[in-house]
Amino acid sequence: MYSPDTTKYLIHISLTAEGVVEKPDVVGAIFGQTEGLLGEDLDLRDLQRTGRVGRIDVQIASKKGETSGEILISTSLDRAETAILAASLETIDRVGPCVAHVSVKMVEDIRVSKRKKIVERAKEILVERFDDGTIDSDELLDDVRQTLRVEKIGTIGEEKLPAGPNVLESDAIIIVEGRADVINLLRYGIKNTVAVEGTNIPKSIVELTEKKTTTAFFDGDRGGELILRELLQVADIDFVAFSPRGKSVEDMSKKEVIKTLRNKVPVEYVRDQYFEDSAELPGDLGGRPARTAPAHDEGGNSDTTGKQAVSQKRIRDGTSKVPTTLRDHMDDVKGKNVARFLNQDMVVIRESRSEEVEKAVETLEEPAAGVVVDRTVDQKLLDRLVWKGLEYVAAKDFKGIIKRPLNIRLMKMSS
């Protein structure tokens, strides 16, 4: 039996008959007039029986007393045998009772057609189906460096807390939730990170915060807020930073980590969110000024304390004209009776008078990440800001807040 998968060539034959004939007449003429013509090895019936020649496809039509059309014969013979078979078909001079003229139009190499289809399909697969595996030398170097950094993770204290290699030597530390957070920050060259490993704050953490400038860097979910609440009660925290909404610290990219740490805020700006009375905070934490020191120790170099102190001094003196952090905006807005809507990059997208903030939030032309407003925020205004999808509100004060939404962060400006 002939298999179409073995086809090598397809013979195209044109047929013209001087009269009306039908398909059985054409097939009969082909077998009858070629029988015994080429010997036993190339007999058409034997070739079909052994599966070396396929079925004879006759496509004809009659018009005005004449019949014309095409005959298609597929073969798995070699080139020479196929040529001989095709030539033998041109000897047919009668179909039924009619004079006929038969000629070979072409012999199509099916394998060439298959190759063309393969090439076209390969092009599609190359463009659409392959993952982007482009090798970038910078990415390779980063991967190797990240591996080295991760291998340097160690432990500190009796509790064996996961920590970066520079925690004990650095003037500033970052406190995160777990080991995965330490590893992620270590990948990006931040080596002064230590994990609390749960809500029971270890003694080693408390002792470190008393000696070093400390930034608390937690997930912006309920768990992160609970850890921060306990940490504020037992430890000496200077700055607070939260991961973006919907992301944990361990999943953040390098750009997101650096941006979040750069936009950290002093603990005084967030303590009212967790404590109704600042007396709940330990010692004089509620009233002491925040120490100015680097939030992260990248590449083992912690000599950025002076630079940050100068930067913050310029902000306090009013010599920095373009605020770049949330703290800058809070200091800049204070006492000016204005409201600023900020995007994720801390860029002002809308500014209005503080008493017109309700109208301004309804006419924003682009999404805002938060608002800094020099006025007291009540429950009605807060609900409207939450409905607009804001992530944080920094205000002069908060009054009458009975229902505090979990998906927005409230920060009170220091007086």
UniProtKB/Swiss-Prot annotation:
Cofactor note: Binds two Mg(2+) per subunit.
Residue span(s) of domain Toprim: 171-250
Gene Ontology terms: cellular component: cytoplasm; DNA-directed RNA polymerase complex; exosome (RNase complex); primosome complex
Record's keyword terms, sorted: DNA replication, DNA-directed RNA polymerase, Magnesium, Metal-binding, Nucleotidyltransferase, Primosome, Transcription, Transferase
GO BP annotations, alphabetical order: DNA replication, synthesis of primer
Chemical reaction(s) catalysed: ssDNA + n NTP = ssDNA/pppN(pN)n-1 hybrid + (n-1) diphosphate
Molecular function in Gene Ontology: DNA-directed RNA polymerase activity; metal ion binding; poly(A) binding
Positions that bind Mg(2+) 1: E177, D219
UniProt EC number: 2.7.7.101
Region spans: Disordered: 280-323
Biased composition (Polar residues): 301-311
Cofactor(s) needed for function: Mg(2+)
Transmembrane segments: none
SMART domains the record matches: TOPRIM
Positions annotated to bind Mg(2+) 2: D219, D221
Domain of life: Archaea
Pfam families: Toprim_4 (PF13662)
Family of the protein in this entry: Belongs to the archaeal DnaG primase family.
Function, as annotated: RNA polymerase that catalyzes the synthesis of short RNA molecules used as primers for DNA polymerase during DNA replication.
Quaternary structure (record): Forms a ternary complex with MCM helicase and DNA.
PANTHER family documented for this protein: DNA PRIMASE
Official protein name in the record: DNA primase DnaG
Organism of origin: Methanoregula boonei (strain DSM 21154 / JCM 14090 / 6A8)
Highest classification ranks of the organism: Archaea, Methanobacteriati, Methanobacteriota, Stenosarchaea group, Methanomicrobia
